[in-house]
Amino acid sequence: MEKNPLAAPLLILWFHLDCVSSILNVEQSPQSLHVQEGDSTNFTCSFPSSNFYALHWYRWETAKSPEALFVMTLNGDEKKKGRISATLNTKEGYSYLYIKGSQPEDSATYLCAF
């Protein structure tokens, strides 16, 4: 079967909740996301702004161990690793994970841990 050269691969990015304590309400959105190759996207991790210590972002590919992407500790923190970046707002209680120009190798589960 001949492939259509105009059909762009579809990336599937999963976003799951991982929190240290059941007392903490950490919310992530969206839970799953389908992105066209080359498109940019972002995930949100919301957390209680009180008792903040650190927020961790991980990337987890099937059959591999989770890879630590960023540890966010300071309000206004901005970190970058290639096409992936993250920002932190401890006063409002959220962090964004951005993926610029998505590629097939970005297909993974992205985790936020508080």
From Swiss-Prot:
Organism, scientific name: Homo sapiens (Human)
Subunit relationships: Alpha-beta TR is a heterodimer composed of an alpha and beta chain; disulfide-linked. The alpha-beta TR is associated with the transmembrane signaling CD3 coreceptor proteins to form the TR-CD3 (TcR or TCR). The assembly of alpha-beta TR heterodimers with CD3 occurs in the endoplasmic reticulum where a single alpha-beta TR heterodimer associates with one CD3D-CD3E heterodimer, one CD3G-CD3E heterodimer and one CD247 homodimer forming a stable octameric structure. CD3D-CD3E and CD3G-CD3E heterodimers preferentially associate with TR alpha and TR beta chains, respectively.
Residues in the signal sequence: 1-22
Function, as annotated: V region of the variable domain of T cell receptor (TR) alpha chain that participates in the antigen recognition. Alpha-beta T cell receptors are antigen specific receptors which are essential to the immune response and are present on the cell surface of T lymphocytes. Recognize peptide-major histocompatibility (MH) (pMH) complexes that are displayed by antigen presenting cells (APC), a prerequisite for efficient T cell adaptive immunity against pathogens.
Gene name tied to this protein: TRAV24
Plastid recorded as keyword: no
Gene3D superfamilies named in the record: Immunoglobulins
GO biological process, one term: adaptive immune response
UniProt protein name: T cell receptor alpha variable 24
